[in-house]
Each structure stands twice: as structure tokens, then as C-alpha cells.
From Swiss-Prot:
<dbReference type="InterPro" id="IPR018181">
    <property type="entry name" value="Heat_shock_70_CS"/>
</dbReference>
<protein>
    <recommendedName>
        <fullName>Heat shock 70 kDa protein cognate 1</fullName>
    </recommendedName>
</protein>
<comment type="similarity">
    <text>Belongs to the heat shock protein 70 family.</text>
</comment>
<dbReference type="InterPro" id="IPR043129">
    <property type="entry name" value="ATPase_NBD"/>
</dbReference>
<dbReference type="GO" id="GO:0005524">
    <property type="term" value="F:ATP binding"/>
</dbReference>
<keyword id="KW-0346">Stress response</keyword>
<keyword id="KW-0547">Nucleotide-binding</keyword>
<dbReference type="GO" id="GO:0140662">
    <property type="term" value="F:ATP-dependent protein folding chaperone"/>
</dbReference>
<dbReference type="InterPro" id="IPR013126">
    <property type="entry name" value="Hsp_70_fam"/>
</dbReference>
<keyword id="KW-0067">ATP-binding</keyword>
<dbReference type="Pfam" id="PF00012">
    <property type="entry name" value="HSP70"/>
</dbReference>
Amino acid sequence: MPKLPAVGIDLGTTYSCVGVFQHGKVEIIANDQGNRTTPSYVAFTESERLIGDAAKNQVAMNPNNTIFDAKRLIGRRFDDATVQSDMKHWPFEAFAENGKPRIRGTFDVSVLTIEDGFEVKATAGDTHLGREDFDNRLVNHLVQEFQRKHGKDLGQNKRALRRLRTACERAKRTLSSSTQASIEIDSLFEGVDFYTSVTRARFEELNGDLFRGT
């Protein structure tokens, strides 16, 4: 009997992807945009619902109606301390319904078999840890740096935070292959330009406990 291919699905907090193991190797399946990962985002406009890359690409212009990080809410109550902490970083609103959080990647792994249905064979990991955790550390660090340099608190401005988060995510990716990344954002908040840099060593220091926990 020929061996059936094994399919792996990573429903991540920030990005999702699908891979198939066959012919002795893993192949990542591209989405309809040709990308090997798909942002775990959904957005709502007056006329349509956007998913993945299309949703993430318009987040700066439509932050209140663009949902991400939703996986963090699974199995938690609205008054959970982690939910309340996460909500401070979201431009969209969450509310309580029967004690559960509702809205308009965690680091976890499950092994399943597919034979007359799905059967979970094993699961492990930190279901609350995702890429956004690392981004949040850098965002918070730069919010403090901006206030220290310019005497302005951008922490309550959703659009400014979204632009800063996008720049932090880009810098994080750069640091995976370089020792330093530049962050340049024109007119970030109240007309003030923000130019700074972050080293890989500093990023690792900000996220040291998260790295050790994995």
C-alpha cells in the first residue's frame, strides 16, 4: 500500500501556512498570491471582507475593523489578565459576552491522523505565545524611546501604533539575518518623524524570557 502524504497546517497567531510531506521532503504550499505564508488577518469594509494579505495590506487605513491575534482568545475569559493585557495592543475593540471575549501564533503543535475524520494524537506548547509577543516587546520599547526623545506619548493613538508595529515587524525580520535594523517612520505622531535603530542583541535582551520559554 503506498504511503499517503502527511499534511501539516500551522494556524499561527500572526501567519499561517500549509505544508505537505511527500517524496521524502516537505513542500510548503503557496497561497493564491503565491506567498508561502498567509497573514492571520481578516478585515471588514463597507462592501467586502478581506482575508490574509489583502486584509493586512490595508490595516493602517482601517485599523478598527481589521482583526488579528484572535487565536489568543481561544479558551479564555474576558476578565483573564492575559486578555486584558493583549487588548491594550489591539486597535479593534473586544467585548464580553457571557464572560467570554468577543470581537468584531501561538507556539503550539498538534499531531493528527486523518482517517474517517480527524483524531488528535498529541499536542504541546504554549498556546499563548506567538510572533506578536516579540513585536509587542519592541513596540513598547520604542514607544518609551519616542516619549523620551520627543516628550510625546503615542501609546493611545491607534494609527501611530499600527504604523510602529508594522515597522517593528519588518525590523524583526531584518534582524533574523542582520545584526542591526533601521526604523524610519515619517510623521509618526503629531508631525514628528521617528528614526532609530535596534540591534539583534537588544532585541534578544527585550525578549530573553520568551526565547528561554520555548
